Amino acid sequence: MKKMHGFTLIELMIVVAIIGVLASIALMQYQNFVVRSQVTRVLMEAGELRLAVEQCLNDGTTTVGNGANECDPRASGSNIISGASQNPEIVIAANTGVVQFPNPLTEETALTATFNNSAASIIHGKKLIWQRQKSGSWYCHSNAAEKFLPSGCKYDASL
């Protein structure tokens, strides 16, 4: 009698099933990673404007614009944020948006970033806000799911 070599059909099917389960777990983790990285990116893009807003407030130039005694925080365009440039003299690239802020700037200015359709579908339309307090400190809050937020940003369902 010859000795058999190789795998049986059932053994091969079990291996394929195990690989399928592992691949589905890895895909879910990757999708969560993509969303978290997009939220962190917008957190940083919006956060960059805090220094410019502080400078404007300290200089007493609270009206947004390019003229004398006006302030332009120079929000950069992002392909995962929606929102038109608030300075009519500045044109941003197509399919990009900028962080929104009030005009005039106040001691409690909010820098608001809204995720557009280029962001992961689970965060479309969600907001991330850097809120200034009268004391001069800033805090972050968002209505994106808490599991996607960095540790310094709090979930806020009211946004």
From Swiss-Prot:
The keyword Disulfide bond applies. Keywords: Disulfide bond, Fimbrium, Membrane, Methylation, Transmembrane, Transmembrane helix. Disulfide bonds join C56-C71, C140-C153. It is a single-pass membrane protein. The modification N-methylphenylalanine is found at F7. It is found in: Fimbrium; Membrane. Pfam families: N_methyl, Pilin. GO terms for biological process: cell adhesion; type IV pilus-dependent motility. The keyword Cell inner membrane does not apply. Residues 1-6 form a propeptide. Its main location: other. GO terms for cellular component: membrane; type IV pilus. InterPro entries: N_methyl_site (IPR012902), Pilin (IPR001082), Pilin-like (IPR045584), T4P/T2SS_Core (IPR050470). The chain crosses the membrane at residues 7-29. SUPFAM superfamilies: Pili subunits. The pili are polar flexible filaments of about 5.4 nanometers diameter and 2.5 micrometers average length; they consist of only a single polypeptide chain arranged in a helical configuration of five subunits per turn in the assembled pilus. Belongs to the N-Me-Phe pilin family. PANTHER family: GENERAL SECRETION PATHWAY PROTEIN G (PTHR30093), PREPILIN PEPTIDASE-DEPENDENT PROTEIN D (PTHR30093:SF34). This is Probable minor fimbrial protein. It comes from Dichelobacter nodosus (Bacteroides nodosus). The gene is fimZ.
